[in-house]
């Protein structure tokens, strides 16, 4: 028997076989396994925050909330799951692992690597956002809004992927122009629009599930998108995918002292 299995780790495929899957009212399939430190009501409310039209596009996905999903270093044994947390195992884990389970795509999310409800929710909604873009693409009305913002050189972006692909799309590092207009890299533009949309979908869902300050999304690698530009994106996403019953979308601005 492999050392990883001997140390108490379990194959992800076994977790999937042995754990009963639940479905929220919006149609998302999910379950929890092991010592996740999650309250079931909080978990259910987070999963139920996914708007129904988005959830319908994720029919092949099942989300497994586990203490730790081990990183690629143990790939020879397949994806392994730790049913409990230890610092040593935590050092070998990753935020999530995608696992093919026959007709189902399993997403195993490491709850114990994500220090609080905000971090867990954002990891979940980022996964949902990417999966939705893969399944449904990007609405043209969103493309038009975001590209107009990029051409107008609004400050910042919503992720490093969006920031880097946007910079590559509009002239790259050379800033080359033809007839005074930037040369557009169409491949980078497509990547930018997809990243911006999946980010907006994730942040929108996060706002339905958790009250948070926009500054909490700040990263050192890129400047955050200007608040007004983000608000325009989120309002459009909310119009396309209204909140489920029992959830509310609201943007509140803090007054300057």
Write out the residue ranges for each language-model feature.
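Pan-zinc metallopeptidase signature
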Residues: 1-22, 182-257
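Short glycine/proline-rich turn/loop motifs
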Residues: 175-183
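Short alpha-helix boundary/capping elements
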Residues: 74-75, 133, 137, 206
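Short pre-active-site segment immediately N-terminal to the catalytic Zn-binding motif
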Residues: 107-125, 186-189
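Generic structural signal of hydrophobic/aromatic residues within well-ordered alpha-helices
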Residues: 46, 50, 150, 166, ...
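Post-HEXXH active-site segment of zinc metalloproteases
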Residues: 118-122, 134-173, 213-222
């Amino acid at each position: 028997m492999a050392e990883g299995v001997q140390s108490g780790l379990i194959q992800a495929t076994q977790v999937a076989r042995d754990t009963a899957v639940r479905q929220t009212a919006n149609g998302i399939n999910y379950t929890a396994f092991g010592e996740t430190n999650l309250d079931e009501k909080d978990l259910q409310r987070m999963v139920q925050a996914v708007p129904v039209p988005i959830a319908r596009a994720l029919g092949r996905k099942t989300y497994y909330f586990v203490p730790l999903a081990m990183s690629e270093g143990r790939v020879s044994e397949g994806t392994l799951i730790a049913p409990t947390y230890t610092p040593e195992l935590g050092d070998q884990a990753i935020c999530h692992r995608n696992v093919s389970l026959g007709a189902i795509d399993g997403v195993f999310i490491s709850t114990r690597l994500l220090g609080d409800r905000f971090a867990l929710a954002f990891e979940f909604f980022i996964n949902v956002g990417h999966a939705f873009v893969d399944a449904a693409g990007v609405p043209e009305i969103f493309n038009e809004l975001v590209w107009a913002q990029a051409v107008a050189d609004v400050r910042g972006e919503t992720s490093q992927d969006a920031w880097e692909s946007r910079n590559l799309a509009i002239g790259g590092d050379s800033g080359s122009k033809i007839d005074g207009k930037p040369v557009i890299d169409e491949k980078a533009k497509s990547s930018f629009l997809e990243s911006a949309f999946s980010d907006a979908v994730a942040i929108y869902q996060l706002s339905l599930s958790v009250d948070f300050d926009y500054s909490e999304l700040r990263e050192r690698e890129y400047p955050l998108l200007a608040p007004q530009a983000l608000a325009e994106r989120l309002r459009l996403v909310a119009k396309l995918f209204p909140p489920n019953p029992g959830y509310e979308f609201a943007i509140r601005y803090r007054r300057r002292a």
